[in-house]
Structures are given as C-alpha cells and as structure tokens.
Curated annotation (Swiss-Prot):
Pfam families: DAO (PF01266), Methyltransf_30 (PF05430). Its EC number is 2.1.1.61, 1.5.-.-. Residues 564-585 are annotated as: Disordered. Keywords: Cytoplasm, FAD, Flavoprotein, Methyltransferase, Multifunctional enzyme, Oxidoreductase, S-adenosyl-L-methionine, Transferase, tRNA processing. This is tRNA 5-methylaminomethyl-2-thiouridine biosynthesis bifunctional protein MnmC. The keyword Plastid does not apply. Catalyzes the last two steps in the biosynthesis of 5-methylaminomethyl-2-thiouridine (mnm(5)s(2)U) at the wobble position (U34) in tRNA. Catalyzes the FAD-dependent demodification of cmnm(5)s(2)U34 to nm(5)s(2)U34, followed by the transfer of a methyl group from S-adenosyl-L-methionine to nm(5)s(2)U34, to form mnm(5)s(2)U34. HAMAP family: MnmC. Its cofactor is FAD.
Length: 585
C-alpha cells in the first residue's frame, strides 16, 4: 500500500440530465430515468425473493456491488422495516470504488420523498472517503450497512461472511470491466451458500457465462420498464438458514470502562443478553478521567491498522454525536519543531477528510472533547453493573464459569469478553501498564482544545492539562506532575493562565508492545478487547462492534487484514517466529 491509496477518488457526477446523475468516469446513469426506486424493488428486492427469503430468519445478509447513491440500501431498509422478523438483524455489505459526497447523495435522494426519513438518517452517518469498510448502524431497525470503499476485487478479498443475496448494480459491464471479471464472479460464489440469490439488470452474455462458470444457476427474467430482460441466479442446493450465531446464551463483559461499555452497547442493541461485571463500578478506572480529546491517530502510512484506526475514529465520532458528555469541536495539534511541522503538512495532504494544516497547527475539524464517565455511563444506561472481582474462569458445562477469589462461581455464561483495562494483564500478559496523571486548574480554557505532547481543554471546574506517562503501574509524585504541566503550558501556550489546582486524577492505562489494541478470540469461549492505551474512546466502539458481530455470526466491521493487525495471538506468533529463526541460525 502507498499513502496515495488511503482515500478513494470521489465520484465525478454529471447533473445535466433531468433524469438524475451520471458517472463521468463510466458515462452511465446511477438509476433508471423512468423510476429508479421501483426498478430497484423489481430487479433486486423481488429478484432476490425478498421479503419471503428472510421470513423467520434471525439474521440475514445482503451483499451488493455498486453502492452508488445508496438508493438500493434505502429500498432494502424500507422493506426490512415493513417485514422484519421478530428480533431480526439485517446486514447490508456493499462495495463502492468512487464514493459520493454527502451533498451529492442528498441531491439524488430528493427525487424520492417517500424515503426522506430513511435518507436523512443515512445522510447523518454518511462516511468519509477512507478506503476499507465503513460501518453504519441503525439499531432501532436491526439494520447495519458496511460500505467497502475500494476496488471490487480488493474489497471482496477482505470479506469473510457468507451472503444470502447479491445485488449486482455496477455500471454497464462494457464500461466497467473490473467489476464484472471472472475473478469477481468466482469470489461471489465463494461467499455464497446454498440458496443464495443474485439479481442484476444486465443480460450480457459474458456475465451469464461468468456466473455459470463460478457455479451459479443462471436464468433470464422479464426486465423492468423498457428493458426487455434481466438476470437472476442462484447458488445450487437447498436453501439454508444462514444465521451463524457463534454464541448461544448470555455474554459476560469483564470491565466497565470504555471497552466494556462499548461491548455491552454493541451486544445489547443486537438483542444479546449481557452480564456487565466490574469490582469498582462503571468508569472507575482509566475511563474515569475528568475530560479527554477524541482525535484520529496520526501515522504517516497506508497500512491495514492505519485504515482500521481511522475507521474506528469515524465510527466513534458518529456513535458519540449527541450523547451526554460529548462536545463536537475542532482540536488543534501544535508541532514540536520544524520537522514535525513538515510531517503535519504532509499528513494533511494525505488525510484531507480528517486534517487541515494552517501553517502553524494541525487542525482536526471532526474531532471533539468528552467527559469520559458521562459517555461510559450513557452507553450502559440500560445495563446493570455487577460489582464482583473475578479471580479465575473455567469451562463449565457448555459455557464458562466465573469464580471470585473465594472460589465461588458467581456467574455462568456462554461467553466471556475480557475488557478490564490494566486488570486484563491477569489474562493476557502481553499488556504493558502505563500510569498517568491529569490536573484541573482554575482558569479559562483555550479557545480550542489544544495538544502538543501534553494537552489542554475545558473540564468541569476549569481547564484540564494532561497527561503524564510513566512506565509501570506506579503513579509519580503529584507536585512533580503539576510543575511539569505548568512549565509545558508556559512554553507552548503562554497565553493560557493556570490558577490553583482544583482537582487531580490518576490512573493506569494498558497498552501493547506495538501500541495497537488486542481484539478477538483467546479461546472458543473467551475473547478480549484491551490494550487501548490512551486511545480507548477512539478505538473501542468499532472494535466492540466487530467483536459483537463475530459473536452473533454477522458481517465483520473491519477488513480481514485490519482484524489480523489487532489479533490477540500476534505477539505469541512473533515470538514463535523469532525462536524458529534463532534455532535455524
């Protein structure tokens, strides 16, 4: 990967025709000039046997090539709302190489007033142009959209969840050959199950032959409007219920900081019973600081973990927007020297959807300031937190038992997720503790939250300055930390007056050797979400969303390479490789 590939090129639209937008790159329309919505219903919804195919299903997955304006997503969403099975969940996973911006999508949606409510909700979460999967969740309707923004083959290679129906809605095959290649058809087959249906406008001969060669049974059907024919296809075999839930029963979440709260929130909105456990209560550890800044991770690279962490920042921003304790406002980052200023300018060029370089500071317009305890409490507002210390976990029957220090089994669950911050080291030794302090001073906060190595922002009671980073779990002297804060502010923000200290906070973070989180399975019945360091509020929600999806057998929220970058087993694998190389030498 190269930095030039971090974002997709935007769609270039021609609005000169009254029928709607055309893609300049392909010289083709996004939808029918006659009635694009009814065409979507006929070709894709009815063409894939919907809604009958999801009747009685707990979980259903629809895949699409060619998200375009999002019209098919809205048509599918509307039908799902009207016919959703009890407690059903619909995953819509779609691919788009050239994303539309929010304003263009809104202009296109204006043609269908009957979809205005759904269109407004979709536009509220409209993603950036970042490559890779972007997860949008609408829990009140049991509906999630995962938009893979990339080349079709690259996107399909990162998908792992089988699909129950495919919408092939790319531009005309002769104008967009990359979307209609044999490699694409073969991958569609690999991601299908017996009974998977395919709907598409085209009847091009090489498309019929390509789908058939991939293993589909293909047939022509009457077309829509003036189009005489269209194609339907099915993966052979008796249709199966593709609901692949990996956990049958309650899930215990150990830890009630931002990691645990994000997990409980993601699981409960999917209807999964949860048991939240923390010996000290909600937001009692590192997630209980007076204030914090939500900013994207700054890294001059285009690698799987960079895409994943940027997608996580975007997801967290959407999740927190409008919640108690979150304040959407730009954050600026001051460079420490000329070399870092040059780096920031380059980063702003590479990440235009996330960063602006003013010549003096790096501004993150989509960032924010938050009150951690309020945010965490809001995410678990409908969940009870059990105050118990768990000393050991053991298999118990078909599930797992959680025992306290006295040896009593306190909880029996189907699955356990360890999200206990620094306390997770008991279960995952590769975590590294880092103690830290913050102080709240009397005085007016800066005009904009500002970071430079330390940071300063508004907090209840005055202006917060943080944070120290001390190796290990021992917090340094308070007077030394305070003197350091005052000296740092005097040097970098001389106009910020700090009065007497009004409050202090200290805690212990948990990080990993490569400074990336760990998220995934430790064993069949135990998973982990930890090692978030000082970026828990930016990264935890999407990692929790991905883990919740995995437990219910849904579509992952991360690309496969992104999941591998966060995999809990990576450090053991690296040690094994080094040992093997040493033995070979």
């Amino acid at each position: 990967m190269t930095p030039d590939g971090l974002y997709c090129d935007p769609a270039e639209l021609d609005w000169s025709q009254p029928s709607g937008p055309r893609a300049r790159a392909y010289g083709d329309v996004y939808f029918s000039a006659e009635d694009g919505l009814e065409e979507a219903r006929a070709v894709f919804l009815r063409g894939c046997g919907l809604p009958e195919a999801w009747t009685g299903r707990r979980h259903y997955v629809v895949g699409e090539l060619g998200f375009g304006t999002g019209l098919n997503a809205l048509a599918l969403w509307q039908l799902w709302r009207q016919t959703r099975p009890t407690d059903g969940w619909l995953d819509f996973v779609t691919v788009e190489k050239h994303p539309l911006d929010r304003d263009a999508a809104a202009r296109a949606f204006a043609a269908w007033p009957e979809l205005s409510d759904l269109a407004s909700r979709l536009l509220t979460q409209w993603p950036s142009r970042l490559r890779g999967p972007q997860r949008l969740v609408f829990p009140e309707d049991g509906f999630a959209i995962t938009i893979f923004q990339d080349e079709v083959e690259a996107a399909l290679s990162q998908m792992t969840r089988p699909v129950d129906a495919w919408f092939l809605d790319g531009f005309a095959p002769d104008r967009n050959a990359a979307m209609w290649s044999q490699a694409v058809f073969n991958r569609l087959g690999e991601l299908s199950v017996p009974g998977t249906r395919v709907g598409t406008f085209t009847v091009a001969g090489f498309v019929r032959r390509g789908l058939a060669e991939a293993g589909f049974d293909v047939a022509k059907r009457p077309g829509f409007g003036r189009k005489r024919e269209r194609l339907e296809a099915v993966w052979p075999g008796e249709a199966v219920d593709g609901s692949l839930a990996n956990v049958d029963g309650p899930v215990a979440v150990l830890g009630a900081g931002i990691a645990g709260a994000s997990l409980v929130h993601a699981l409960r909105r999917r209807g999964i019973e949860t048991v939240l456990i923390d010996a000290h209560g909600v937001a009692s550890g590192a997630s209980g600081a007076p204030a914090g800044l939500l900013t994207p991770r700054l890294e001059k690279a285009d690698r799987p973990h960079v895409r994943a962490t940027l997608a996580a920042f975007d997801f967290a921003r959407r999740l927190y927007d409008g919640r108690p304790g979150f304040h959407a406002e730009p954050v600026r980052r001051l460079p420490k020297d000329e070399r870092e200023a040059e780096r920031f300018a380059i980063l702003a060029d590479w990440m235009p959807d996330h960063l602006d370089w003013t010549g003096e500071a790096l501004v993150m317009p989509g960032a924010g300031r938050f009150e951690p305890a309020r945010l965490v409490a809001d995410l678990v507002a409908d969940a009870q937190c059990h105050r118990a210390r768990i000393g050991r976990v053991e298999p118990l029957g078909s599930g797992i038992g959680l025992y306290d220090d006295a040896g009593e089994c306190r909880f029996e669950v189907a699955h356990l997720v360890i999200a206990a911050g620094a306390g997770a080291r008991r279960f995952y030794p590769d975590l590294q503790p880092s103690a830290g302090q913050l102080a709240v001073f009397d005085g007016a906060p800066p005009d904009m939250p500002t970071a430079w190595g330390n940071y300063a922002c508004a907090a209840p009671g005055g202006v917060l300055v943080g944070a120290t980073h001390d190796r290990g779990d021992q917090v340094g002297p308070e007077d030394v930390a305070e003197a350091g804060f005052r000296a740092s502010v005097a040097e970098r923000m001389p106009g910020l007056a700090l009065g007497p200290v009004q409050g202090r906070w200290q805690g212990v973070r948990a990080a990993t050797p490569d400074r990336l989180p760990v998220a995934g399975r430790l064993s069949e019945r135990v998973s982990i979400l930890a090692g978030l360091g000082s970026r828990g509020f930016a990264h935890a929600p999407l990692l929790a969303e991905d883990l919740a999806s995995e437990l219910m057998g849904g579509v992952p929220a991360l690309a496969q390479t992104g999941r591998e970058a966060m995999a809990p087993g990576r450090f053991a694998e690296r040690r094994s490789r080094r040992a093997g190389q040493g033995a070979a030498g």
